[in-house]
From Swiss-Prot:
GO MF terms, alphabetically ordered: ubiquitin protein ligase activity; ubiquitin-protein transferase activity; zinc ion binding
Post-translational modification summary for this protein: Autoubiquitinated in vitro.
Compartments where found: Early endosome
Protein name, as recorded: E3 ubiquitin-protein ligase MGRN1
Annotated region described as Disordered, given as residue ranges: 355-384, 439-552
Transport among keywords: no
Lipid-anchored residues (N-myristoyl glycine): G2
Entry remark concerning the domains of this protein: The RING finger is required for ubiquitin ligase activity.
Sequence motif Required for TSG101-binding, residues: 406-409
Primary role: E3 ubiquitin-protein ligase. Mediates monoubiquitination at multiple sites of TSG101 in the presence of UBE2D1, but not of UBE2G1, nor UBE2H. Plays a role in the regulation of endosome-to-lysosome trafficking. Impairs MC1R- and MC4R-signaling by competing with GNAS-binding to MCRs and inhibiting agonist-induced cAMP production. Does not inhibit ADRB2-signaling. Does not promote MC1R ubiquitination. Acts also as a negative regulator of hedgehog signaling.
Acidic residues bias (residue ranges): 464-475
Record carries keyword Flavoprotein: no
Pathway stated in the Swiss-Prot or TrEMBL entry: Protein modification; protein ubiquitination
């Protein structure tokens, strides 16, 4: 295989290769892969030669069974990798079957069983003019670098529909209907032995004699499923991109969704994992892909730590064989077009020795099973006038810095409306309780110290013995609480101000204190009548605080 890639000839040798050849997995004899692989211009050895680096080994059967000539010159070491341009893309999530009920309910001419007719619809994007054709029960063959599909019968091939360039274009062809009443159950799925695909959607770039895009195509392979109620649905299998007569198998990257898509509704669960941060440190943006599970979940720093300390993916816990960093580049903002500063972007630029731009740059994977090359600074690979950014930022834009959430005020900082302005913040809660007690004693009401109407502090609860003693001394004048002792025995100026306010309060302040007492009385069990009363708790006032009863 290495000799085939090293040759530079105009064509490819016409080798007679059977269907079950060495280019089918598993092969009859020998190995499918060699003992090393090249990525980013570097060579990596692996002790698992039969391990597909970008997915499952069975995915290799979706590729062609014949070797092809690699059309590009092997890049020199430390030379940026050339990226491929995708001119056509079929959104596989939009692929669906549309049933025609009028024709499905009508019996056939023979009167055997009713016809079950469906048609295919999907959405696609095109940066060039394309020609789309649908094939059913078709086999694949590559001729001169182009994929040619041959259906089982001519009636299983649709007419070719031409489209102009555009985004989010809808494909619908009611004239081509699929009659599942004529299909067998084994024809609904992909047959590996025969190499027959249930349905193939081929979109070929149709730009005339433009050499740059000649032979460029996008292929969607799908299968059908039959449900218990007799209905059918379509299931995408794989997508392939054919560029310069080479077929590339497209693989999904998990965690790279475009959040700007209006069709995708945001999740109501705030705890869902829909952020762009690394799943390990929860601070830096994700820019490292784990292979072969293809989870984009790590930042640069955590990836360097993981490759030396563990060999399992933090998401699926499967062992990984390589780490691939993917980043993008953008034009630097000019003097007249300032761009808001992003601290996350600044952190990414500070770790430039680990960066690996996606375009015009060289990715540096790390393999635990192979050598661990030292990463070099690749700032020279960034084109002039561009700067590297995260791939997630390129898709979803720069992340806006959320404003700082103000912290909740401390207990001492809460202001009370019934206290004079001369009191300090630390003495406000004590003065408020003292004011309520003094105003209640001035009215001369009987005081009840029942346990149900007692205001307790979590740091100093009242024991049962104290509760019984308080219930016996109902008619006796109440002793001074801890709050009153703390205020009246103090010699500070604030304590004198507190006593003056309590003893000679103005009518307005007395009314305000009475309103507070009325609120407390309305919430008592006698006024509410809601069954067993509930205890009221306040945060601890301090290490020397004690519980204070509320007058009824």
């Amino acid at each position: 295989m290495g000799s085939i890639l090293s040759r530079r000839i105009a064509g490819v040798e016409d080798i007679d290769i059977q269907a079950n050849s060495a280019y089918r997995y598993p092969p009859k004899s020998g190995n499918y892969f060699a003992s090393h692989f090249f990525m980013g211009g570097e060579k990596f050895d692996t002790p698992h030669p039969e391990g597909y680096l970008f997915g499952e080994n069975m995915d290799l059967n979706f590729l062609g069974s014949r070797p092809v000539q690699f059309p590009y010159v092997t890049p020199a070491p430390h030379e940026p990798v050339k990226t491929l341009r995708s001119l056509v893309n079929i959104r596989k999530d939009s692929l669906r079957l549309v049933r025609y009920k009028d024709d499905a309910d009508s019996p056939t001419e023979d009167g055997d069983k009713p016809r079950v007719l469906y048609s295919l619809e999907f959405t696609f994007d095109a940066d060039a003019r394309v020609a789309i054709t649908i094939y059913c029960q078709a086999s694949e063959e590559f001729l001169n670098g182009r994929a040619v599909y041959s259906p089982k019968s001519p009636s299983l091939q649709s007419e070719t529909v031409h489209y102009k360039r555009g985004v989010s274009q809808q494909f619908s062809l009611p004239s081509f209907k699929i009659d599942f009443s004529e299909w067998k159950d084994d024809e609904l799925n992909f047959d590996l032995d025969r190499g027959v695909f249930p349905v193939v959607i081929q979109a070929v770039v149709d730009e005339g004699d433009v050499v740059e895009v000649t032979g460029h195509a996008h292929v969607l392979l799908a299968a059908f499923e039959k449900h218990m109620d007799g209905s059918f649905s379509v299931k995408p299998l794989k997508q392939k991109q054919i560029v310069d007569r080479v077929s590339y198998l497209l693989q999904e990257i998990y965690g790279i969704e475009n959040k700007n898509n209006q069709e995708t509704k945001p999740s109501d669960d705030e705890n869902s994992d829909n952020s762009n941060e690394c799943v390990v440190c929860l601070s830096d943006l994700r820019d490292t892909l784990i292979l072969p599970c293809r989870h984009l979940c790590l930042c640069t720093s955590c990836a360097d730590t993981l490759r030396y300390q563990a060999n399992n993916c933090p998401i699926c816990r499967l062992p990984f064989r390589a780490l691939l960093q993917i980043r993008a580049v953008r034009k630097k903002p000019g003097a007249l077009s300032p761009v808001s500063f992003s601290p996350v972007l600044a952190q990414s630029l500070e770790h430039d020795e680990h960066s690996c731009p996606f375009k015009k740059s060289k990715p540096h994977p790390a393999s635990l099973a192979s050598k661990k090359p030292k990463r070099e600074t690749n700032s020279d690979s960034v084109p002039p006038g561009y700067e590297p950014i995260s791939l997630l930022e390129a898709l979803n834009g720069l992340r806006a810095v959320s404003p700082a959430i103000p912290s909740a005020p401390l207990y001492e900082e809460i202001t009370y409306s019934g206290i004079s302005d001369g009191l300090s913040q630390a003495s406000c809660p004590l003065a408020a309780i003292d004011h309520i007690l003094d105003s209640s004693r001035q009215k001369g009401r009987p005081q009840s110290k029942a346990p149900d109407s007692t205001l307790r502090s979590p740091s100093s609860p009242i024991h049962e013995e104290d509760e019984e003693k308080l219930s016996e001394d109902v008619d006796a004048p109440p002793p001074l609480g801890g709050a009153e002792l703390a205020l009246r025995e103090s010699s500070s100026p604030e304590s004198f101000i507190t006593e003056e306010v309590d003893e000679s309060s103005s009518p307005q302040q007395g009314t305000r204190a009475a309103s507070i007492e009325n609120v407390l009385q309305d919430s008592s069990p006698e006024h509410c009548g809601r069954g067993p009363p509930a205890d009221i708790y306040l945060p601890a006032l301090g290490p020397d605080s004690c519980s204070v009863g509320i007058d009824e």
